[in-house]
Amino acid sequence: MIKQRTLKNVIRATGVGLHTGEKVYLTLRPAAPNSGIKFRRVDLAEPVVIDARPDNVGDTTLSTTLVKGDVRISTVEHLLSAFAGLGIDNAYVDVSAPEVPIMDGSAGPFVFLIQSAGVQEQEAPKQFIRIKRPLQVEDGDKWARFEPHDGFKVTFTIDFDHPVFDKNSQTASIEFSSTSFVKEIARARTFGFMRDIEMLRKNRLALGGSMDNAIVVDKFRVLNEDGLRSGDEFVKHKILDAIGDLYLLGHSLIGSFTGYKSGHGLNNHLLCELLKARDAWEMVSFEDEGYAPISYMRTAPAGR
């Protein structure tokens, strides 16, 4: 039987919020079977728990933000992507601020934290959502689509009219496994344009952004001294984001996702439409690991 997974141990880290610039204390804790991923604001007089679910997404400006009443937890997608990549079904995520720390702008540090905590299999079957028919949402020339597929495949295309993007790949595809996620996707960093930074900061956004946690691009080039980690790092980060956004379903997917210039808002719209279309998906589990179309490593060394 493919079993649900949680963390073996509690693990802690400290970082800064990308948009708030605040110091954030992060704690990842094990959770019981069928708990799902639960985020907790522990800096409030009474801690507030927000389940990682599509209907709890209240804002998708520049990141995916979970909302309950007037309580917010932003930038959840990179950590959710790491949970998805290592097959973690159940965990508590405690944060001391309204944002998950940005770390280095990728999912790599979160993969390292999860591996350091250890992965614990639980005595409950892992539930997958299998896509049964195509489903697409659109916004102008942008679109996102699910299709049936025997595995989990993510394809993404970005389209930036810019010298740096013109000479690097703007389309990428990954056939998902823990190995491919850790090696190919996890270390792709978020990126931003110098021209946008002043406007963002006037709006109290990107206050914690720096070249330590993002790829920064001016009119002509990448400004980071160490350059890109790979020629397709920009589009690979969009795949990383999409994997995190899709994990708000609370289950690993069996199917293909294709995004064309899609972002957090359109990704979430697709999830909400999927959940409404009950003929488009089904829940499945696997008694025999050999029949499962997706493989998860027990441990996967974080790439350097």
Swiss-Prot record:
Transferase is among the record's keywords: no
MF-aspect GO terms: metal ion binding; UDP-3-O-acyl-N-acetylglucosamine deacetylase activity
PANTHER family: UDP-3-O-ACYL-N-ACETYLGLUCOSAMINE DEACETYLASE 1, MITOCHONDRIAL-RELATED
Gene Ontology biological process terms from the UniProt entry: lipid A biosynthetic process
Pathway: Glycolipid biosynthesis; lipid IV(A) biosynthesis; lipid IV(A) from (3R)-3-hydroxytetradecanoyl-[acyl-carrier-protein] and UDP-N-acetyl-alpha-D-glucosamine: step 2/6
Organism, as annotated: Methylococcus capsulatus (strain ATCC 33009 / NCIMB 11132 / Bath)
Pfam families: LpxC (PF03331)
Keywords assigned by UniProt, alphabetized: Hydrolase, Lipid A biosynthesis, Lipid biosynthesis, Lipid metabolism, Metal-binding, Zinc
GO cellular component: membrane
Domain of life of the source: Bacteria
UniProt xrefs under SUPFAM superfamilies: Ribosomal protein S5 domain 2-like
Cysteine disulfide links: none
Annotated gene: lpxC
Keyword Lipid biosynthesis: yes
Name assigned to this protein: UDP-3-O-acyl-N-acetylglucosamine deacetylase
Binding site for Zn(2+): H78, H237, D241
EC number: 3.5.1.108
Cofactor(s) of this protein: Zn(2+)
Catalytic machinery residues: H264
Reaction equation(s) it catalyzes: a UDP-3-O-[(3R)-3-hydroxyacyl]-N-acetyl-alpha-D-glucosamine + H2O = a UDP-3-O-[(3R)-3-hydroxyacyl]-alpha-D-glucosamine + acetate
InterPro entries to which the protein is assigned, alphabetical: Ribosomal_Su5_D2-typ_SF, UDP-acyl_GlcNac_deAcase, UDP-acyl_GlcNac_deAcase_C, UDP-acyl_N-AcGlcN_deAcase_N
Coiled-coil features, chain-numbered ranges: none
